[in-house]
């Protein structure tokens, strides 16, 4: 066991009475998700010693980090990315989104299955497979996972120049990302594809974690509820996001429904330049409006892929304008 100054957290945990026994695997995660097992904090601490000061015994006698502490969550992510994905350098600004990695990995793996469903159940891999990450942020999570798991190359876009500067540092310090992740700034805050997608560029899929809320007040209220559930009874009027996030990452006019509806509308102009457009949808109540928008633009095929992490259920919606014949031609040209 690793020792922790000033007191061994594992020793404290092991001596606690009524230690709760947790299942060895997290329910609901994709079979290929590297994070199905419970966190091995011994192994993570070897990979990232900076995590050690943030480890402490829980009320159940287990070892964990304080998920209400943004710095602890950031250090856990840093350890996970180094241990599982070989990322030697990873740092993000204090106010940037620090997403839970297991859920993000699930999106990537289910997206791989979506591509495989059009390719004889074989996942297309390698640098020929190009993906567009809308809102890549400073964290670069989707490109990191997609490159490590499937060898895909990515273009990541964002409206925040500071986030892109941090992302560029992550790319420059990790050899595996230097030739597989290209970053572009979206200079029009009202545009999604326009301005960052060249006329001749083709993508096998897009992915996006859209802003969830419709206002800053709504985002703050959600954070207060999360902190209350985590046992933080004294919550400030302006609470700190435990997973971080700037305004542009957390909310936009119209919220999730408005953002994805605009994405659907813009996708028409790129109909023949992309196989699958996709976006996470956090609120189930958002789905009817998105389906309506997709019927309006006459998408040829629409799929909703459900995902689960414990009791939390999420999904992403995927749509394509390619006919079956066009899909077959795309596969033969790019995935063979």
From Swiss-Prot:
It holds the Pfam family Methyltransf_10. SUPFAM superfamilies: S-adenosyl-L-methionine-dependent methyltransferases (SSF53335). Keywords: Cytoplasm, Methyltransferase, rRNA processing, S-adenosyl-L-methionine, Transferase. The keyword Transmembrane does not apply. Its EC number is 2.1.1.181. One of its GO terms (biological process) is rRNA base methylation. One of its GO terms (cellular component) is cytoplasm. InterPro entries: METTL16/RlmF, rRNA_lsu_MeTfrase_F, SAM-dependent_MTases_sf. One of its GO terms (molecular function) is 23S rRNA (adenine(1618)-N(6))-methyltransferase activity. It catalyses: adenosine(1618) in 23S rRNA + S-adenosyl-L-methionine = N(6)-methyladenosine(1618) in 23S rRNA + S-adenosyl-L-homocysteine + H(+). It is found in: Cytoplasm. It comes from the Bacteria. NCBIfam families: PRK11727.1. Belongs to the methyltransferase superfamily. METTL16/RlmF family. HAMAP family: 23SrRNA_methyltr_F (MF_01848). Specifically methylates the adenine in position 1618 of 23S rRNA. This is Ribosomal RNA large subunit methyltransferase F. It comes from Yersinia pestis (strain Pestoides F). The gene is rlmF.
């Amino acid at each position: 066991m690793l020792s922790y100054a000033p007191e061994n957290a594992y020793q404290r945990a092991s001596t606690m009475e009524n230690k709760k026994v947790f299942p060895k695997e997290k329910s609901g995660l994709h079979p290929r998700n590297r994070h199905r097992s419970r966190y091995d904090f011994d192994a993570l601490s070897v990979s990232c010693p900076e995590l050690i000061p943030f480890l402490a015994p829980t009320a159940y006698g287990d070892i964990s980090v304080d998920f209400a502490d943004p710095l602890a969550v950031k250090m856990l992510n840093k350890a996970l990315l180094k241990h599982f994905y070989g990322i030697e350098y990873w740092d993000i600004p204090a106010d940037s989104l620090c997403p839970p990695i297991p859920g993000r990995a699930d999106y990537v793996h289910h997206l791989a299955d979506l591509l495989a469903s059009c390719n004889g159940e074989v996942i297309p891999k390698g640098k020929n497979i190009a993906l567009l990450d809308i809102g890549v942020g400073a964290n670069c999570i989707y490109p990191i996972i997609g490159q490590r798991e499937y060898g895909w190359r990515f273009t990541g876009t964002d409206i925040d120049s500071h986030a892109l500067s941090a992302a560029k540092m992550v790319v420059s310090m990790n050899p595996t990302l230097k030739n597989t992740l290209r970053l572009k700034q979206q200079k029009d805050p009202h545009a999604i594809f326009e301005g960052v997608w060249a006329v001749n560029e083709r993508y096998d899929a897009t992915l996006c974690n859209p802003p969830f809320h419709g206002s800053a007040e709504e985002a703050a209220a959600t954070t207060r509820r999360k902190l209350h559930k985590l046992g933080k009874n004294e919550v400030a009027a302006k609470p700190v996001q435990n997973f971080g996030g700037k305004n542009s990452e957390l909310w936009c006019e119209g919220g999730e429904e408005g953002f994805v509806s605009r994405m659907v509308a813009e996708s028409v102009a790129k109909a023949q330049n992309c196989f699958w457009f996709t976006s996470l949808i956090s609120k189930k109540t958002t789905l009817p409006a998105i389906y309506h928008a997709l019927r309006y633009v006459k998408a040829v095929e629409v799929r909703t892929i459900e995902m689960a992490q414990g009791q939390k259920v999420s999904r992403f919606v995927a749509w394509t304008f390619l006919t079956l014949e066009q899909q077959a031609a795309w596969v033969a040209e790019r995935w063979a």
